[in-house]
């Protein structure tokens, strides 16, 4: 009882279990057929007895149907065409449980139904599922699917793969069946990743030759969208070599003239990718993020890493996000399990879910829409444990242990296989490992496939043109590995020795950044570029500061 002259005593009771109990009660009503007031019928004839209020609360489609002046408002049975009963059952169960199972088999049908019936949360979950499973062999179809159903994230990320890996994409069977409009859309992208004439002429010829009778008249239109110089001799030869494209000399000459008419063309360089330098070490840990466009040779600075005292972390890129995993702090060598994620589009950092195993000097790569953390050091000894982060499930998942735990090794992905090369093994890195370990995610198995010609640690590896390149280390030796032939070959040596450098592929070339040449005892600031066509290295610029042990990744512009 309140004292005289004071406000009434108020106690606000809030039952935290009420929302769950409330939903459970309606679930029971649904299962028992109690208080139902609407029936949904599939084309197969299967019916579901539901509650209008529950459907309207989850679906804008049903909310509009039951509140607007529509004939269905007064009906007790609603017939829904074009929706399989399994899909409708899943959506109805979601309305009563807040859960729905999404699989590779049902995801597209489920998204279509969720889009139609405006179950917006389910549609978004399906969209994220499809983004998680994007690859070169489905990105064209997914891009069209995303455009039709207005899925902005799926559209953007499928376009990112389509443009950044165009050479691999056009060699897929799916490419031959695309429409002229879709092909023109691809060619018109300013960020289409092409760096050779044949890289863009070949798919045009291949697509035309696939259905030459119906597509031959499209050829001139396609060529007019190519924003690079086209060699008339090369074009004539390419057309002539396609036996299904048999033209008269006049027809070839006409095609060449129209395609190369400057009134129809805009010759320009394509800005396809941007290099991100994350942190690093220069006598102390660095926390800066530096962003470089190789076309303009301009550096800009991004938001700094929030945890600025750590070093020897793993860095990898997944879509627009850059993941920084593990490492250790300067004042001790205790391995960390912390994860920071940098969004390159918003220039913002967020803290991610900690890894299952703390580690430093480990390898980090992306494969199949997931982020992998492999090996590294923990308590002075190389770790065999490996794990991956599934951004859809928002959890780290352990995988099979590596055959040999290694620290300060290098890893990259080629044809959906992870390769881990070299590194230190033994307590506190007492010896160097000479084997190449490969991981097949389909069977969750590691294998030893070959030996490195010169075992080292502190190297970088990158995939290019179906081959794996080893750069950096204590020498200037650069080597190329062909997995199909299981052969190594030495290529042109680098200009500098670069221990713990960074390396990335951009526009068909290898860029190697910074590093530490033990012979000189200084940190490097320069950037070397390797052109595989010329088999030649050259200095093409400088980092904002000298550094080693930094993250170096490429984000493709969309």
Curated annotation (Swiss-Prot):
UniProt cross-references to PROSITE patterns, sorted A to Z: BTB
Keywords: Kelch repeat, Repeat
Kelch repeats: 274-320, 321-369, 370-416, 418-466, 467-508, 510-557
One Pfam family named in its UniProt record: BTB
Stretches assigned to the BTB domain: 36-104
Entries under InterPro entries matching the protein: BACK (IPR011705), BTB-kelch_protein (IPR017096), BTB/POZ_dom (IPR000210), BTB_POZ_KLHL23 (IPR030566), Kelch-typ_b-propeller (IPR015915), Kelch_1 (IPR006652), KLHL23_BACK (IPR047068), SKP1/BTB/POZ_sf (IPR011333)
Annotated BACK domain residues: 139-240
UniProt keyword annotation of Secreted present: no
Cross-referenced SUPFAM superfamilies: Kelch motif, POZ domain
Protein name listed in UniProt: Kelch-like protein 23
Organism, as annotated: Pongo abelii (Sumatran orangutan)
């Amino acid at each position: 009882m309140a004292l005289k002259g004071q406000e009434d005593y108020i106690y606000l009771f809030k039952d935290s279990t009420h929302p769950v109990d409330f939903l459970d009660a309606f679930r029971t009503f649904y299962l028992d057929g109690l208080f139902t007031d609407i029936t949904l019928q599939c084309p197969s004839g299967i019916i579901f007895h539901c509650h209008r209020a529950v459907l309207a609360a989850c679906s804008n489609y049903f909310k509009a149907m039951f509140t607007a002046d529509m004939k269905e408002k007064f009906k007790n049975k609603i017939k829904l065409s074009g929706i399989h009963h399994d899909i409708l059952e899943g959506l109805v169960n979601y309305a009563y449980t807040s859960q729905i199972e999404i699989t590779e088999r049902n995801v597209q049908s489920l998204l279509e139904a969720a889009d139609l019936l405006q179950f917006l949360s389910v549609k978004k979950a399906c969209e994220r599922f499809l983004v998680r499973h994007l690859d070169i062999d489905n990105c064209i179809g997914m891009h069209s699917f995303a455009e039709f159903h207005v899925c902005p994230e799926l559209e953007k990320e499928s376009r990112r793969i389509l443009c950044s890996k165009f050479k691999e994409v056009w060699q897929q069977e799916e490419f031959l069946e695309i429409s002229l409009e879709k092909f023109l859309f691809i060619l018109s992208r300013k960020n289409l990743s092409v760096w050779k004439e044949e890289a863009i002429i070949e798919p045009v010829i291949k697509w035309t030759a696939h259905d030459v009778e119906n597509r031959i008249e499209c050829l001139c239109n396609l060529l007019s969208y190519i924003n690079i110089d086209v060699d008339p001799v090369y074009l004539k030869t390419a057309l002539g070599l396609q036996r299904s494209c048999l033209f008269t000399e006049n027809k070839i000459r006409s095609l060449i003239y129209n395609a190369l008419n400057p009134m129809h063309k805009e010759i320009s360089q394509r800005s396809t990718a941007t290099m991100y330098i994350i942190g690093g070490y220069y006598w102390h840990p660095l926390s800066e993020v530096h962003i470089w466009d190789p076309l303009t040779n301009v550096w800009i600075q991004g938001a700094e890493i929030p945890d600025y005292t750590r070093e020897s972390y793993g860095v990898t890129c997944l879509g627009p996000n850059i993941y920084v995993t593990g490492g250790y702090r300067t004042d001790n060598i205790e391995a960390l399990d912390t994860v920071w994620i940098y969004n390159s589009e918003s220039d913002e950092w967020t803290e991610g879910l900690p890894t299952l195993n703390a580690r430093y000097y480990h390898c980090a790569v992306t494969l199949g829409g997931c982020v992998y953390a492999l090996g590294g050091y923990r308590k002075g000894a190389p770790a065999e444990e490996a794990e991956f982060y599934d951004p859809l499930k928002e959890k780290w998942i352990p995988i099979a242990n590596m055959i040999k735990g290694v620290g300060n090794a290098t890893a990259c992905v080629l044809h959906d296989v992870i390769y881990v090369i070299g590194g230190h093994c033994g307590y506190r890195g007492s010896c160097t490992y000479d084997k190449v370990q490969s991981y097949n995610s389909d069977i969750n198995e590691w294998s030893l496939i070959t030996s490195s010609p010169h075992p080292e640690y502190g190297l970088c590896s990158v995939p290019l043109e179906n081959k794996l390149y080893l750069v950096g280390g204590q020498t200037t030796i650069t080597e190329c590995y062909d997995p199909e032939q299981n052969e190594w070959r030495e290529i042109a040596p680098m200009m500098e020795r670069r221990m713990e450098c960074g390396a990335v592929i951009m526009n068909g070339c290898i860029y190697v950044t910074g590093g530490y040449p033990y012979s000189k005892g200084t940190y490097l600031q320069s950037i070397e570029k390797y052109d595989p066509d010329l088999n030649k290295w050259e200095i093409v610029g400088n980092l904002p500061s000298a550094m080693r042990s930094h993250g170096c990744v490429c984000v493709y512009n969309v």
